[in-house]
Amino acid sequence: VIQYLPYIFIAAVAAAVAFCLTPFLSWLGERQGLLDRPGVRSDRTVHLSPVPRLGGIAIFAGFAIAVAIWLGLESPVVRGTLVGGFLIMLLGLIDDLRPMSAKVKFLFQLAAALVLVLYGVKIEWLTNPLGGYIYLGNWGLPLTIFWVVAMVNVVNLIDGLDGLAAGVSS
């Protein structure tokens, strides 16, 4: 168990940051009228009363602070991950406040994925379920961009289901 303490600590930091920010962001969302009202924008919403729309900020803050503590900010890959993640969080926030077209969201997601790639984040290898690894070579860049955009949309699809996105993302 002792060898896992650093991992437990960093997970606890991320959870604590998100946990501490959530009440403030909920209060702010309610005070500013930044609420997701059932049936107004999406039929995927399952809650029966309005809920604040600022939860993504708490999730990202927990992630970013934990990553900065754990890995530091010296690595371009870490910085790229945080910048790209911030852009996606910002996209979600803007879309929550002023809905955007699918085309605009896609272009924003593509830009965030390109930022990751420019910072050196790239899928280079795939694990072969039959054993060994598969080197992707030049296919790594388009696969990385596709994967980032796909995962952003997967989380977006489950967002609004009362904490499901937060749980899956954590």
State the predicted function of each range.
Residues 2-170:
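"…together with the soluble PPM/PP2C metallo-phosphatase catalytic core" -> "…together
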